[in-house]
């Protein structure tokens, strides 16, 4: 493996950024901690730019703005593996996510190496090297980081940099275009935020609520999100989903009644109980109630519509020479049915359409989907 440099000064970072602007592509990864916070804590940034591999230490108080500006440069191409949570970190610190990204997990899937291939499996396939994963659960905020932690972090971009051109060469021009489009789609999705007033539409057990309870649930979801962000604690630390559902259905009116709610912590009642009760009152006072929601799989016509969409997915996968799961998962099919049958028109103007309606999927499937929904319901 290449020798690596741990960057702990602004001068070192500026010098690296200048070098990185003149290479064909960067291999990028991040290490972070998110066990007890809403916002992830960035612990390390690993980058390989040609023959230079650096570990950027954000914990020591570096000015990272030159690096973020580097990543925003449309002439800088970025290679990343399974970048989902990395994109959230970048959005949090940069205010945006770079769009010129090639995700090697997506590339490997389109090259026929299986869906959701992990980094260790990717390295094993291309180099026959076993990557040490013993540090995957380490605390990246602690200092100093041990040599084995630094070696582990460096390996995440060392091999990725060399694998990228080999993987890219396996893809036809059409598949390369699809990989780039899918990478861009995944980046865009991580940057989206559902407006608070529509969060209840995507709450798994919302169908158990009547219309009045849905109005309360709508307010409760906004309360929980606001509390989590302001206190920088995970959503589940404020209130778990089953607790929100119980609150919405029982609609407690007093602090004493809050104490009878399953798993609602005394800390939440003490410091946020008044705001919680206010949210419930606001939901109860709503004059325009949400439409009743049914469990999707129980709705009339669900099964034939699901199967008809699945047939189109299978046909498209065969046409493209990829696995059906790369076109759409069961959840993505359900997202389309949910969108058509349960998302109000008013909400659709505020929300991004399901995956099957956008990008390369939409170009191939949208006409077929429209025909299915006109025919089967």
Regions found by a protein language model. Give the residues of each.
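Short, glycine/acidic-enriched capping/hinge loops at junctions between secondary-structure elements
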Residues: 37-41, 55-58
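Short amphipathic alpha-helical segments
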Residues: 39-40, 90-92, 165
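Non-catalytic, usually N-terminal nucleic-acid engagement modules in DNA/RNA processing proteins
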Residues: 27, 36, 43-47
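Short beta-turn/strand-loop junction motif enriched in small, turn-promoting residues
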Residues: 31-33, 263-264
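N-terminal accessory regions of nucleic-acid-interacting proteins
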Residues: 1-26, 30
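Active-site-proximal helix-loop-helix substrate-binding element of RNase H-like nuclease domains
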Residues: 4-6, 46, 51-66, 70-161, ...
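Accessory DNA-binding and partner-docking regions appended to nucleic-acid-acting proteins
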Residues: 147, 167-377
């Amino acid at each position: 493996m290449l020798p690596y440099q741990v960057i702990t000064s602004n001068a070192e970072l500026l010098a690296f950024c200048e070098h990185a602007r003149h290479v064909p592509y960067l291999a990028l990864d991040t290490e972070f901690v998110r066990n007890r916070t809403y916002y992830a804590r960035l612990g390390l940034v690993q980058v390989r730019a040609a023959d230079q591999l650096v570990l950027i230490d954000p914990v020591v108080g570096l000015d990272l703005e030159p690096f973020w500006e580097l990543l925003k440069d449309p002439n800088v191409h970025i290679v990343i593996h399974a970048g989902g949570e990395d994109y959230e970190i970048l959005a949090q610190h940069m205010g945006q996510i770079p769009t010129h990204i090639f995700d090697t997990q997506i590339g490997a899937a389109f090259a026929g190496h299986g869906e959701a291939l992990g980094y260790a499996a990717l390295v094993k396939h291309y180099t026959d090297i076993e990557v040490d994963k013993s540090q995957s659960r380490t605390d990246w905020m602690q200092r100093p980081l041990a040599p084995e932690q630094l070696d582990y972090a460096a390996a995440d971009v060392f091999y990725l940099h060399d694998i990228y051109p080999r993987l890219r060469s396996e893809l036809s021009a059409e598949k390369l275009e699809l990989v780039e489009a899918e990478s861009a789609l995944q980046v865009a999705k991580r940057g989206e935020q559902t407006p608070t007033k529509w969060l209840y539409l995507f709450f798994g057990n919302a169908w158990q609520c009547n219309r009045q309870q849905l109005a309360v649930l709508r307010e409760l979801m906004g309360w929980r999100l606001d509390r989590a962000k302001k206190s920088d604690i995970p959503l589940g630390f404020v209130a778990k989903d089953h607790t929100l559902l119980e609150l919405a259905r029982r609609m407690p009116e007093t602090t004493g009644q809050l104490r009878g709610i399953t798993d609602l912590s005394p800390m939440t009642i003490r410091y946020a109980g008044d705001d919680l009760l206010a949210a419930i009152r606001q939901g109860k006072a709503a004059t325009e109630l949400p439409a009743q929601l049914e469990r999707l799989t129980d709705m009339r016509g669900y099964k034939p519509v699901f199967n008809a969409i699945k047939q189109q997915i299978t046909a498209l996968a065969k046409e493209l020479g990829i696995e059906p799961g790369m076109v759409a998962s069961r959840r993505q099919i359900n997202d389309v049915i949910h969108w058509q049958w349960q998302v109000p028109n008013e909400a659709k103007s505020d929300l991004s359409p399901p995956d099957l309606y956008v990008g390369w999927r939409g170009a191939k499937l949208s006409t077929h989907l429209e025909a299915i929904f006109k025919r089967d319901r």
